[in-house]
C-alpha cells in the first residue's frame, strides 16, 4: 500500500462548497453522456425536497436498488452513500445528487482521475464505520489532527482508523453473503433478476461460505467489531472482492425501462466439474485473474474420482496442457482418532508434525445451523498454477503469479514471495509439492521448510498444509503471526484449465 502522503489530503481536508462541487464534476466526467443523463433521470424520479434541495430518502434508495430484505443491508449502503456528501450532521442522513454521484464513482471504478484505488477503498471502508459521521464532525474540524493524518504514512493511517473506527461484524457477514449471492449479476441487471439465489436451498450453503470469508477477513472471532485495517488488507489480497457491488449500483446508470431485463447468461451449470460449483467459483473470483471469471472459459482436465488417484493419470492429462490451471482439493481433516481403511496413514511418520491444527474460533462463534463439525472436518484447498505443468525431479516450476488458497473452513490467499522460486513440484515418485525445497546435494525433498507450503502424496490420497511465516508463499493477510498445519485425507482432486484466449467481458471494478 505504498502511497505518497499528499494523496490523502483530498480525502480528509474540509473542502469549501466550490472545491467540493469542482471535485464532483471531475467524478462525473468519468461517466459518459448517456450515463450522466440516466443518473439524473433516475434520481429525479424518486427524489423529494429537503430545505429546498432534492434528495433521496432511505426508502427511495432501498426501492431503487432492491436489495432483498433477507440481507438487511439497505440502511448500511444508504448511510455509506450519504457519507460521500458534505453534510456532517450525525443525526440527519440525506442523500444528495452529488453524494450519490461520488458514491457511484467510487463503487463502480469511475474514480481514477480523482482518487487512487487505495483512496477509494479507504473512503468506502470509512463510510461503513459506525463512528464515521461523528469522526467527521469532531476530528476533521481539528486542523492540527488533520495535518498529522495527511502527512502520515499508510501504517499510521491504518492505526488511526483502528483506534477511532469500528465496523459491525454482522454487517460484513451480510456483505459477504450478498456478494456470493449476486456474483453473476451483470451491469444493468436488478437484483430481482437473481432473486432465486436468496430463496432456494443453496442459500444455506451461501450463508456458510459467507462465514468462511468472514473468518478470512478478521481473526478476532469473538469480537463484534472488525478493524478497518483488516478490510483494507483483505482487499489487497482479494482485489475483486467487491466487484459485484459495481454491477449492483451501476443500475442507476441505466434507463429505468431496462432494469427488469435479465442479461443473457453465459454461465454453464458446471455439470462437468467434480468440485467446482457456482459458489466456489464466486469465491475464487475474489482473487483470481479475470480470465477465470467466465465459466465458459474453464475446462475440467482431471478428476481423480473419474480418472483415477494416480500421478501417472494426472501426468497424462496435464503435462501437455500449456495454459494456466486451477488445482482444487476436497478433503477431510485427519485428527488423532482418524483411521483409514484403504491404506495406513504414515504421513506423521514421514513428516513429523511441527504445529498444531488451526481451530477457527470457538463453538460459540460458529452458528449452530452450520453444524458441530464446522471446525474439524471439511477442508477445501487449491492452487493457481500460472504456467504449464512439467516433471520436476530436479527443480520446480511456476512463476510469481502462482498462488495457494484455502476456501473452507476459512477463506485465505497465499501469494508468491520473492524469497525463493520453489513454487510447484511434480514428481511421480514423491507427489505434488508447493513451497517445498530440495537438498542441494542429495536432491531429496525437504518438508521442514519455513513459510506456507502444501504437499500431496504420490497416491493422491492424503496431504498436509502448513502456515508458518514467509517462504516461497506469503502467509495469509491478517494472519501473519499464526502458525498451524493441517493433515487431510483427499476425497477428490480436480485440475481445471483456464482458456486465456477467450475475450473477457469488460466490467467496471469498484475496488
From Swiss-Prot:
Pfam family, one: TLD
InterPro entries the UniProt entry points to: TLDc_dom (IPR006571)
Keyword vocabulary terms for this entry: Cytoplasm, Nucleus
Residues covered by the TLDc domain: 274-499
Disulfide partners: none
GO cellular component: cytosol; nucleus
One Gene Ontology biological process: response to oxidative stress
Highest taxon of source: Eukaryota
Localization per Swiss-Prot or TrEMBL: Cytoplasm; Nucleus
Function statement: May be involved in a process influencing telomere capping.
Protein family membership: Belongs to the RTC5 family.
The protein's name: Restriction of telomere capping protein 5
Amino acid at each position: 500500500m505504498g502511497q505518497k502522503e499528499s494523496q490523502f489530503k483530498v480525502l480528509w481536508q474540509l473542502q469549501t462548497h466550490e472545491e467540493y462541487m469542482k471535485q464532483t464534476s471531475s467524478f462525473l466526467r468519468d461517466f459518459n453522456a448517456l450515463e450522466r443523463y440516466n443518473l439524473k433521470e433516475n434520481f429525479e424520479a424518486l427524489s423529494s425536497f429537503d430545505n429546498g434541495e432534492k434528495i433521496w430518502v432511505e426508502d427511495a434508495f432501498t426501492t431503487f436498488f432492491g436489495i432483498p430484505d433477507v440481507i438487511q443491508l439497505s440502511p448500511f449502503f444508504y448511510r455509506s452513500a450519504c457519507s460521500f456528501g458534505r453534510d456532517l450532521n450525525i443525526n440527519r442522513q440525506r442523500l444528495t445528487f452529488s453524494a450519490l454521484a461520488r458514491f457511484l464513482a467510487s463503487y463502480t471504478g469511475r474514480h481514477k482521475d480523482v482518487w487512487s484505488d487505495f483512496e477509494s477503498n479507504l473512503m468506502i471502508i470509512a463510510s461503513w464505520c459506525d463512528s464515521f459521521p461523528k469522526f467527521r464532525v469532531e476530528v476533521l474540524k481539528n486542523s492540527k489532527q488533520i495535518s498529522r493524518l495527511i502527512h502520515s504514512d499508510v501504517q499510521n493511517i491504518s492505526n488511526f482508523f483502528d483506534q477511532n473506527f469500528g465496523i459491525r461484524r454482522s454487517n460484513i457477514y451480510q456483505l459477504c453473503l450478498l456478494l456470493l449471492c449476486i456474483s453473476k449479476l451483470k451491469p444493468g441487471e436488478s437484483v430481482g433478476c437473481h432473486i432465486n439465489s436468496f430463496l432456494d436451498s443453496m442459500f444455506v450453503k451461501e450463508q456458510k461460505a459467507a462465514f468462511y470469508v468472514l473468518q478470512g477477513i478478521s481473526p478476532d472471532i469473538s469480537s463484534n467489531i472488525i478493524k478497518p485495517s483488516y478490510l483494507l488488507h483483505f482487499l489487497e489480497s482479494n482485489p475483486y472482492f467487491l466487484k459485484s457491488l459495481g454491477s449492483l449500483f451501476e443500475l442507476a446508470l441505466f434507463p429505468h425501462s431496462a432494469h427488469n431485463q435479465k442479461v443473457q447468461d453465459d454461465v454453464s451449470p458446471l455439470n462437468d466439474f467434480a468440485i467446482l460449483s457456482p459458489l466456489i467459483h464466486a469465491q475464487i473470483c475474489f482473487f483470481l485473474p479475470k480470465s477465470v471469471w467466465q465459466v465458459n472459459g474453464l475446462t475440467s482436465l482431471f478428476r481423480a474420482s473419474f480418472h483415477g488417484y494416480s500421478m501417472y493419470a494426472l501426468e497424462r492429462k496435464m503435462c501437455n496442457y500449456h495454459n494456466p490451471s486451477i488445482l482444487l482439493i476436497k478433503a477431510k481433516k485427519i485428527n488423532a482418532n482418524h483411521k483409514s481403511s484403504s491404506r495406513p496413514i504414515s504421513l506423521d511418520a514421514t513428516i513429523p508434525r511441527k504445529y498444531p491444527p488451526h481451530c477457527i474460533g470457538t463453538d460459540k462463534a460458529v452458528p449452530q445451523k452450520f453444524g458441530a463439525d464446522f471446525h474439524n472436518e471439511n477442508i477445501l484447498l487449491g492452487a493457481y498454477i500460472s504456467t504449464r505443468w512439467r516433471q520436476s525431479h530436479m527443480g520446480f516450476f511456476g512463476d510469481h503469479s502462482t498462488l495457494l488458497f484455502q476456501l473452507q473452513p476459512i477463506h485465505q490467499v497465499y501469494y508468491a514471495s520473492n524469497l525463493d522460486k520453489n513454487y510447484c513440484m511434480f514428481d511421480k515418485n514423491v507427489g505434488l509439492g508447493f513451497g517445498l525445497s530440495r537438498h542441494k546435494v542429495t536432491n531429496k525433498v525437504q518438508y521442514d521448510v519455513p513459510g506456507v507450503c502444501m504437499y500431496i502424496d504420490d497416491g493422491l490420497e492424503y496431504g498436509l498444509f502448513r502456515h508458518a511465516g514467509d517462504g516461497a508463499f506469503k502467509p495469509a493477510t491478517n494472519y501473519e503471526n499464526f502458525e498451524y498445519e493441517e493433515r487431510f485425507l483427499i476425497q477428490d482432486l480436480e485440475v481445471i484449465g483456464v482458456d486465456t484466449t477467450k475475450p473477457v467481458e469488460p466490467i467496471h471494478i469498484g475496488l
